[in-house]
Amino acid sequence: MTQTPDREKALELAVAQIEKSYGKGSVMRLGDEARQPISVIPTGSIALDVALGIGGLPRGRVIEIYGPESSGKTTVALHAVANAQAAGGVAAFIDAEHALDPDYAKKLGVDTDSLLVSQPDTGEQALEIADMLIRSGALDIVVIDSVAALVPRAELEGEMGDSHVGLQARLMSQALRKMTGALNNSGTTAIFINQLRDKIGVMFGSPETTTGGKALKFYASVRMDVRRVETLKDGTNAVGNRTRVKVVKNKCLAEGTRIFDPVTGTTHRIEDVVDGRKPIHVVAAAKDGTLHARPVVSWFDQGTRDVIGLRIAGGAIVWATPDHKVLTEYGWRAAGELRKGDRVAQPRRFDGFGDSAPIPADHARLLGYLIGDGRDGWVGGKTPINFINVQRALIDDVTRIAATLGCAAHPQGRISLAIAHRPGERNGVADLCQQAGIYGKLAWEKTIPNWFFEPDIAADIVGNLLFGLFESDGWVSREQTGALRVGYTTTSEQLAHQIHWLLLRFGVGSTVRDYDPTQKRPSIVNGRRIQSKRQVFEVRISGMDNVTAFAESVPMWGPRGAALIQAIPEATQGRRRGSQATYLAAEMTDAVLNYLDERGVTAQEAAAMIGVASGDPRGGMKQVLGASRLRRDRVQALADALDDKFLHDMLAEELRYSVIREVLPTRRARTFDLEVEELHTLVAEGVVVHNCSPPFKQAEFDILYGKGISREGSLIDMGVDQGLIRKSGAWFTYEGEQLGQGKENARNFLVENADVADEIEKKIKEKLGIGAVVTDDPSNDGVLPAPVDF
């Protein structure tokens, strides 16, 4: 809506008043000026510059470098100082450890004559000096070495053994609050070198932690974990170290986020996992869209932060920091960028089956009955196990199975069955319940034993368990559209999520939501009213593709199964809306259509191969395979007819894409990080997200004794990785010119031929798109630099 002249004038007056009070540029329209690339300070290693993503350390930001002793932390910081000075900048070094070696710094390229050095007496003095230098606006980079040496004045003036709990953490928090604004305004980069300490009593995971509290983790735009990997040798002489730097950033999930462990079948809340440092497994997504179980290897409590909520179709809500990456049908996007109507990735299928049978199928079915409608005896076995159900077919089935386990079933009225062992025989039903962990448990405490989540369990074992559950507390209903729904209702939250994940093994999609027992379902085909004073959870299967898959996967001879089978033919007549699992990701549409065009497959040919399920070929190939998105069943039929590997690879993706119904307002919450081994993703609240610590980018380079980071060695490593330098045996070759035999000789060649080294560096940066040059008029080519996420 266009603003009226009076409102525009009022806004101009307000902006003028703000600029008068706080300076020009305090308020601006984002479209008034072109966005400039982030200015950076090179680190001296092209590999590390690439890992940072923008060609170096960002100016105007806080950087934390931490790691074990003698790992190369100070060397990395001094190289940044040398590069800042080489560009004409001014550098300062706050030597709180009183351990700076001027000769070593000079060998790394630092201009020690112009370097500002301070060796403060207390932590307050060090941070105050740094703050004053930053606020001068004349400084390009300042290094504080180290956080552990920033000892508060009160501790220095006290006696040995005095306790000063949290004093240094409060000092760091206050200093960073003051400094961050000044750093941004002056464009100064502040590097804090930090040390590692070990937490006492840690049983699982790494006990390592950094000093100075948690404030630095939050204020740091970039955190770098420096580790020495191996010793470099020239013959038998050690000449340096191979160093690995992991670039760490903080993106987090909020407390309350539920994470499923596919190994134990247990759903955990993320705060319980982190606080207890539980060595759980999670479901993680690979780049090809397949799902795998992977262990959690690190746990991080990231404090209280702003989080936003994404309400997904089906009821799931994910709360995450706005910069946390979520997998969408167009790739990874920050949670804060997502809007209502966008689609996010959820599991479509997971794990599959083998041929293992930990218990017979009849026993699995009995467990399903007893989890749903059983009231198990108390420990001691004197109280019989009761099965309460009105269906005669189920009562007869329980009676028959109990007889094979040394038990007799005695009717207790019309709907109850008491199961007790026969004289002289062992109570096999009680043994089965105890083995499964449900003996003596109340309804809301019951769960499915972890054997059912073994990767090689047979499908009929799981199918019979689900049969027993479905026939006890399940239901079938009809929507207003005529489509069917199937579900299961329970007071056990763990049980509801376990059923959801077992259904995914059959490729049956479902949702878990809170259920209000006072609500009336649209039209019950077969089921019963739920009455409970406790919280109730519902597993709901929607979409005729999922309902049909459920009917094909689980035995259907019971009363509810028979009702479902009878209702399916009518429900599948005409056009019925399927679930989101029916469709491929929108990102795949062009790839599939272009491939078929290149292969020479016409719309008419594709329609003939697909058959009656095909779309109208007069609308082209896209209409044949779907409409706005391609239908999985049609692409599957075409892939089978063509026996085409490319199409089968596309269909191997185990994800579906569900729409975001609502973006919830920001709130404050505790947030947590996990590090997931290898794949660096996980399924949280049923949505695929980056593991809270996103895939760490790593860089490896050589630090030579007395020389520092080997720029030339890093260029050789990156050149080989990017295909610019060819390695054949021990020889390194660049554009037909031999650099030398062995890395040391190739390194010496680049030292002596700086123009070749510069050319290789330029080509690496151009290929990877880093190291943008700031121009006077960035709009000359009509393209603005991409924003950089820190």
From Swiss-Prot:
Q: What is its main location?
A: cytoplasm
Isoglutamyl lysine isopeptide (Lys-Gln) (interchain with Q-Cter in protein Pup) crosslink: positions?
762
A GO term from the CC aspect: cytosol
Transmembrane residues, as ranges?
A: none
Mind telling me which InterPro entries this protein's record contains?
A: AAA+_ATPase, DNA_recomb/repair_RecA, DNA_recomb/repair_RecA_CS, Hint_dom_C, Hint_dom_N, Hint_dom_sf, Homing_endonucl, INTEIN
Q: Which positions are annotated as binding ATP?
A: 67-74
Q: Extract the CDD domains matched here.
A: Hint, RecA
Q: Which GO terms describe its molecular function?
A: ATP binding; ATP hydrolysis activity; ATP-dependent activity, acting on DNA; ATP-dependent DNA damage sensor activity; damaged DNA binding; DNA endonuclease activity; DNA strand exchange activity; magnesium ion binding
* Factors inducing expression: By DNA damage, and by ADP-ribosylation catalyzed by DarT (at protein level).
For biological process, the GO terms are: DNA damage response; DNA strand invasion; intein-mediated protein splicing; intron homing; recombinational repair; response to antibiotic; SOS response; UV protection
A Pfam family annotated for this UniProt entry: LAGLIDADG_3
* Keyword annotations: ATP-binding, Autocatalytic cleavage, Cytoplasm, DNA damage, DNA recombination, DNA repair, DNA-binding, Endonuclease, Hydrolase, Intron homing, Isopeptide bond, Nuclease, Nucleotide-binding, Protein splicing, SOS response, Ubl conjugation
Might you give the EC number(s) for this enzyme?
3.1.-.-
**Superkingdom, taxonomy of origin:** Bacteria
- Report the outcome of residue 305 to Q: In strain: Canetti and SO93
Per the record, the similarity remark reads: Belongs to the RecA family.
- UniProt cross-references to NCBIfam families, sorted A to Z: intein_Cterm (TIGR01443), intein_Nterm (TIGR01445), PRK09519.1 (NF007072), tigrfam_recA (TIGR02012)
Q: How does it assemble?
A: Interacts with UvrD1 and UvrA. Co-immunoprecipitates with DarG in the presence and absence of darT.
Q: What is this protein called?
A: Protein RecA
Q: Which organism is it from?
A: Mycobacterium tuberculosis (strain ATCC 25618 / H37Rv)
Q: What gene, per UniProt, encodes this protein?
A: recA
